[in-house]
Amino acid sequence: MAWLVEDRRTQLAAAGESLLTEAMKTELREKYFPRYPTKRAVTLPALHLVQHTYGWIPTQALQEVAQFLELAPAEVLDTATFYEEYWLKPKGKYLLQVCRSLSCEICGSRDLTDHLSKKLKVEVGETTPDKRFTLIELECLGSCGTAPAVLVNEVLHENLTVKQLDELIDKLPEDPHAYHDPTIDWKDEH
C-alpha cells in the first residue's frame, strides 16, 4: 500500500513574516494574560484570534502560538483539533453550519443538510470548488426553541424550511463582508 502525501499548508506570510503579529501578541498580553492563571489557559483565545484574523488557523500560526505561549506545538495542535470550531485548512467564503441537535433533527435539519449537499454538490465537511461555501454540521447552536437552525458565517437563521434556505443561499452577496444580520437596520447604527 502506498501512502499519498499531500502538502496542505498554505503560505500566507512571506519568509520571515509572522502570522501572529505584534498587535495580536499585545492584545493577548493585555486582554487575556491578566484574566487567566497560566499562559496555557490563553491557548483558546489565541486560536480564536488567529482564526478570526485569517478565517482559519495555518500550521505556521499554530507553531507561533505555541512559541508565544511557551508550549509544545503538539499541545496547541491537540487543542485546535479537539474543538469543532477551529479550522486547520481554508474554508469557503461562507461557512454554512447546520445544527444537528435532537430538536433540529426532529424539525428537519437533515432535510436542510441533504438539500445543501445536493445544491452545492459537496458532502458535509467539504468546500465548493469555487471556494464560496463550506458545509458542516454542528452538534448544537443553542436555538432548540426555533429549530431547525443554520448559522451562516456568524448570522443565525432559525425556523428554516428548505425553500427559505434556498432563497437565503441564492441572495448571499459575493462579498461575505457585505453580509450581515438582515434583522438589523444598519442605517440606524451609524
Which sequence ranges carry the predicted segments?
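Signature of N-terminal electron-transfer/Fe-S-associated modules in redox systems
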Residues: 1-190
